[in-house]
Each structure stands twice: as C-alpha cells, then as structure tokens.
C-alpha cells in the first residue's frame, strides 16, 4: 500500500535536476530515521539510477548517552550499506544560547561531512510539526522587534524554507516539511524501525519545547499555506527594485533617486532598501521595528538631512538619497599569514602570504576620487571613502583595497551563512550590486523548492 512518507521521498528524488549523492543528517530521532529509511527504500524500489546516500550523525556531546546513540545510528546505516560518519562537537559549550550555538555547529559539521563523503547536498528531516513551531516562534518575536522586513509583516510566517544554501557552497533540503511527525512514526513502526527520544525535546527551559506544549494544548495551529511562495514572490519583486532603483558604488555607497527616496510605504521597496542598508552596515539581520518606524518618518518627510539606522547613514539631499556605513566603531583586524578574517561584517580579507592588518582608510583619497568619478557628490564620496578597508602588511606598507598580498571580497551577512531558497533571487540581486558572483543554484527544480508547507 502506498504511504505518504514513501511517496514524499519519491517525489523529492524526482525533483532533482540530475541524480545526486545525498547526505542525510540522522540524529537517531524519528524524523531523521524516517527520512533515511524512506529515501533508501525509494532509491531501491524505484531503481533511481545515479542517486546514492551517505549519512552523518552530529554528536553535540551535551548528554552522556549521545556517543552511544551515534554509534547505534552508525550500526543501522552499516546494515543498510550506507556510508556513515560521526562528527563530534568538541570544546567548551556556551552557557547561554546553547540551542542556537548547537544549530550553527551542526550545519558546519554536516557541511564538512558532506565534503568528506562526496555528497552534493544535505537532507534534513524537519517536519510540519517543526514548521508550526518555527512559525509560532518567529511571529511571536516579530511583534515589536521588526522581524522580517523591518515592519513585523510576517516574513517569519513563511517559516523554514524547503531549501537553504549554507555557507555559499552546499544546499540543505527539507523534503518532509509537509508531513506530520505522527505519519513518520507510523511509517517506521510498520517497518519495525525504532528511534531515539532526546530528553532535551521535553525540557521546558527551551523556547521550542514551550511553544510545542502550547500548540498541543490549543489543539494545534494551522501552518499558513503558500507563505513560502508569497515570500519568494516578494523577494523577486524586491530584487527587481534593487536592480532598477539602487546603484551601489564600489560596495561603499548606495544611491537612490530623489523620486524613489520617499516611497517607503511600498512593502517591497521598503524591503529592498532595508536589505541593501543591512548589507552596507555589515548586519546579519534587518533593522528593528522601532528603528524602521523612525526611518520611515524621516524618508516620508522629504526633507534633506541625515539619519543613522543600523550603522548606516541615510543622507538625503536634493539630488537623491545616499546610504553609507557610519564612521564609528570601525575595528582593526589582524590576519595571519595565509589566513582569512572578516572585517566589520562587510569584507572578507584573505592573506596571500604575509600577515596583514586591516583598518579603516582614514584618508580615503583613492576611494574619494573613484566615487566622485562615478558621479557622486564630493561630500558623499568623502564620507563613503573613510569606511573602506585599508590593508597594511606587517612591515607597515600600505596596500590598495583588493591588491596583493591580500584578496578582499564583500561579505553579505544576511545571506552568506544561511540563504533560504525563497530569498535566492533577491540575494543574487544584492550580490551582483556589490560586485559578487551570484549564489550557487539549488540541485532541485525551483517549483518544488518552495513547497515548504
């Protein structure tokens, strides 16, 4: 008899543009075990040529039993003939924010395992239950803190994307977002497959556990259908506006015409403008709700002047609106020989040999000239230039931005670590504006990427 879990796995494999080697993240819990078993069965039964599986268990070393549980998963994979790797989170753990830190480390270790096992992408067993919890948490956080586009307008309601690019290099796919956990457990029970229940999933000290309990006692909550597609459509519209209305000069100054500067009440334009501002400011998140409210009032007024929001100066003049990083709290970064580092959340500096020091270019003469030549007012060019990085070798010799012995590339904090699939079009528009290549395309068809609910 057909089963929804197996059908979902088959449809997931059919969504690939070409067959791939898939790394399945397997904790030993029901969701990930169900994903592993379903994909293994689908590949075997349908004779999906060219597909293969590998698996990885991340041992966070937060519980005494975790090492044995990881070995149990390894034995299960061995019985199925699936290559498996255990990656352990070594070192000290933070005393606060442990779940967020564990999540970041988990993706880092999974990406390393994918490289080691020759996998092209990673599959994770997040379910509809996880999606409901995520939506509930993001909506709660969005009330008053500007989650999403800076107005609390429900980007959190889109939940987790069915695809996510990690670290600009490997796609993480979530094929089970439309399935309930109960369906997956029924599928496993029918096949006599057991799973591990992590006691931390019942610990009310964690926000997700508390949200899960509230959802259960309230009889469940609907996951808004189509929000991922709505988010993708909004991203596409915002991307078009970035391309048409915003000129980014030398990755230092963004220019907007006077005509469009005050149209902040258009949600797609607001999102486009705030996205570019966040990138210029080296931020990983959009501005907070209260900040956006003040900024919107300033832009609506049409009056010339300057306002700072999210480390970015919004400089409004008769000729247009100009955005640039404020000249405050600019760091000094030491980069060792052959190493790389992130400066000010905006630039990645890779040493090609000797150690270098990165600091703000106090004089900014080179960049002032370039920005003036690009048509910017002299005052704007000067202000934008003083926040450019200057690289000095250990012997103190100054080096021009991007010249040997260091390579400099713009860092896009909003997207370079985690890029949801439904934001890829906008992320590409931002990358091109800042002189970067587009992000890698996903291995599955776009029409299926966004089926996250």
Curated annotation (Swiss-Prot):
Q: Which cell locations does it reside in?
A: Cytoplasm
Report the protein name in the record.
tRNA(Ile)-lysidine synthase
Q: Which PANTHER family match?
A: TRNA(ILE)-LYSIDINE SYNTHASE-RELATED
Family classification? Belongs to the tRNA(Ile)-lysidine synthase family.
A biological process (GO) of this protein is: tRNA modification
**A molecular function GO annotation:** tRNA(Ile)-lysidine synthase activity
Q: What does this protein do?
A: Ligates lysine onto the cytidine present at position 34 of the AUA codon-specific tRNA(Ile) that contains the anticodon CAU, in an ATP-dependent manner. Cytidine is converted to lysidine, thus changing the amino acid specificity of the tRNA from methionine to isoleucine.
Main location per UniProt?
cytoplasm
- EC number(s): the record gives 6.3.4.19
Residues recorded as binding ATP, renumbered to this chain, are 27-32
Q: Does the keyword Nucleotide-binding apply?
A: yes
Q: Which UniProt keywords apply?
A: ATP-binding, Cytoplasm, Ligase, Nucleotide-binding, tRNA processing
Q: What note about domains is in the entry?
A: The N-terminal region contains the highly conserved SGGXDS motif, predicted to be a P-loop motif involved in ATP binding.
What InterPro entries does the record point to? Answer: Rossmann-like_a/b/a_fold (IPR014729), TilS/TtcA_N (IPR011063), tRNA_Ile_lys_synt (IPR012094), tRNA_Ile_lys_synt_N (IPR012795)
Catalytic activity from the UniProt record: cytidine(34) in tRNA(Ile2) + L-lysine + ATP = lysidine(34) in tRNA(Ile2) + AMP + diphosphate + H(+)
What is the source species?
A: Rhizobium meliloti (strain 1021)
Instruction: Give me the Gene Ontology terms describing cellular component.
Output: cytoplasm
Is Cytoplasm one of the keywords UniProt gives this record? yes
Uppermost EC category: ligase
Q: List the Pfam families.
A: ATP_bind_3
Say which domain of life the source belongs to. Answer: Bacteria
